[in-house]
Amino acid sequence: MRILLAAAECAPMIKVGGMGDVVGSLPPSLIKLGHDVRVIIPGYGKLWSLLDVSNEPVFRANTMGTDFSVYEAKHPIHNYVIYLVGHPTFDSDQIYGGENEDWRFTFFASATAEFAWNCWKPQVLHCHDWHTGMIPVWMHQDPEISTVFTIHNLKYQGPWRWKLEKMTWCPWYMHGDHTMAAAMLYADRVNAVSPTYADEIKTHEYGESLEGLLNYISGKLRGILNGIDLDEWNPAKDSVLPAKFSINNLENRQENKKILQREMGLEVNPKKYLLGMVSRLVDQKGVDLLLQVSRRLLAYTDSQIAVLGTGDRYLESGLWQLALDYPGRFSVFLTYDDSLSRLIYGGSDAFLMPSRFEPCGISQLLAMRYGSIPIVRRVGGLVDTVLPHDPENNSGTGFCFDRFEPIDFYTSLVRSWEAFRHKDSWKLLQKRAMSQEFSWQRSALEYEIMYKDVCGIKEPSPDVAEVEKFSYGQSADPSLKKV
């Protein structure tokens, strides 16, 4: 099948959130299944020097009253084809924000539609989040191109109808209130990035005022869990980690822990319980819960906390004040640093994700891969990926709580701290977490089933029986299943 993915991000070149990881890592797994998969993204300024871009455009056209060109490049790691939409509105390196954000992405969607109609015509055009939301609306006219729309975060919904009517030429059948609603209404298939999130967004609590529409289209809505690139994220080969380790030599993690403590200004003591967090510092991620419980936790236990990220200034200030009040025990770096994030995954004892909502979450998968035990709220993709620790039955992969309340989060933190003191049991917990496999293999099989379904292809694909061989979290190594 010919499949074109359209998105605002593509890792590792352009990445802000989980969407970039999906768009960058899903194509190689689909290509292994025999499909011709390509990606189209805006031609942001820095991409022209990062990628080997064709000298001449492969396509030129005019849309929304302005000319644009499409150039061809190759993904720097996986070598599949990437198309860049060239236009002065994308010349800066800024991805989101700005006064013309709505126009920029509506223009990108229109340019992508023109490209798909007139240059490289896919059988499936896979659109990601509101930035590409107008594509299913336009493609609804073309019976030869099927559209799939993936919801990465329902909270961000794009420009409203009145603004779209001014920017586009087809307001008369725009029944949705905004880009996200229009995409869900007109796409042939819709998926969320985890099964639990697909169910949650049909409720008032998580539906962001779209629960009515989501229930209306529930027949074409499904949840497909994201994965991670197991080659890129491998603690046994990670060049960034000072000490490489695997499930068979966990003692090497202690060296990473000491270096992490030193780099973040914490007391260097491997016996201390070290909690890590790598996140956007926003309400969605539950940073306000961390602010509410940290003082009590640090008073009651000998824990240390290391936070890496940027975001809301109020939350940043609260974390900074904690670092001033608890030197050597609480540290925050208000930036994003890939090397330091890997060190946190590979050196912390546990990883914090007390999210208000979490469509899928990638960080908990990386934490488990690197032996850091996730402490999560049971919501969205965290429900699908982290199993509650049960010391009596030696099962589970993390610590979970249900209500978004400080006392519930605090209780999970204390439970994890007490579990950490039982070293043999903790080591088994780490091994269970590290033995989980959330590769893109199963996700790609599920996407393939959806693609063939939407195109009406009846020939057998690796169907449900084949997919079941790769149950979520199942280890590829049979020897690890008994841990």
UniProtKB/Swiss-Prot annotation:
This is Glycogen synthase. The gene is glgA. Disulfide bonds: none annotated. CDD domains: GT5_Glycogen_synthase_DULL1-like. It comes from Prochlorococcus marinus (strain MIT 9301). NCBIfam families: glgA, PRK00654.1-3. The keyword Glycosyltransferase applies. ADP-alpha-D-glucose binds at K15. It catalyses: [(1->4)-alpha-D-glucosyl](n) + ADP-alpha-D-glucose = [(1->4)-alpha-D-glucosyl](n+1) + ADP + H(+).
